């Protein structure tokens, strides 16, 4: 239903945010900017 669709979108957005944060962290740690 609608609720599960919303949950799926939120999960996807959370993964995207976490991924970009990890990229920034790696960038700072390893100087790969």
From Swiss-Prot:
A Pfam family this protein belongs to? Answer: Antimicrobial_2
Cellular location(s):
Secreted
Give the source's domain of life in one word: Eukaryota
- List all disulphide bridges recorded for this chain: 27-33
Q: What is its main location?
A: secreted
Upper classification of the organism? Eukaryota, Metazoa, Chordata, Craniata, Vertebrata
Main function: Antimicrobial peptide.
> Keywords of this protein's UniProt record, alphabetized?
Amphibian defense peptide, Antibiotic, Antimicrobial, Disulfide bond, Secreted
Q: Name one GO cellular component term.
A: extracellular region
Q: Which GO terms describe its biological process?
A: defense response to bacterium
So what family is this one in? Belongs to the frog skin active peptide (FSAP) family. Brevinin subfamily.
**What's the protein name?**
Brevinin-2DYa
Quote the tissue specificity entry.
Answer: Expressed by the skin glands.
